[in-house]
């Protein structure tokens, strides 16, 4: 997808895509709860798709204030530990339980290209307004939501993303 402009999902686009992935559309789009769950996690945690797909049950740790993920970012090699909302933790744990996923196993045993391919099929079916949506749009959606809910605080988003500068975050 190099060279292609990716935009953040709007709230409406996010809801429509996730609903379509969970429910499917007749014979055109088969339901795919796994991909829907992957994108929900990306949009609610702000991870890159590769980092989302590398999550294991053992990535979760109990902290005095709740739960956190321990990951090493694929792109940067940076070690990250960050708090996860209880609702997100429970959502992901319920998914892992329903799929019979053990501690050391990947929660989402699927490749990045497979997720991108299925998302593109859904976006192509949804039509105009969805052509610039990719898996990265869900990470951007997370940042956009944080930005507006916190008084347009770009520095907060930069810190959450662990970007080197606000200019990188704003791009």
Predicted features and spans:
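DNA breakage-rejoining catalytic core of tyrosine-based enzymes
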Residues: 1-19, 77-86
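Basic, Lys/Arg- and aromatic-enriched nucleic-acid-binding interface segment
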Residues: 7, 11-45
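Active-site/catalytic core of tyrosine-dependent DNA strand-transfer enzymes
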Residues: 14-15, 85-130
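Short, basic (Lys/Arg/His-rich) helix/loop patches that form interaction surfaces
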Residues: 21-30, 103, 117-159
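Short, charged phosphate-coordinating catalytic segments
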Residues: 42-65, 155
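Conserved tyrosine-mediated DNA breakage-rejoining catalytic core shared by Y-recombinases
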Residues: 54-89
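Short, polar N-cap/turn motifs at the start of nucleic acid-interacting alpha helices
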Residues: 59-64, 152-171
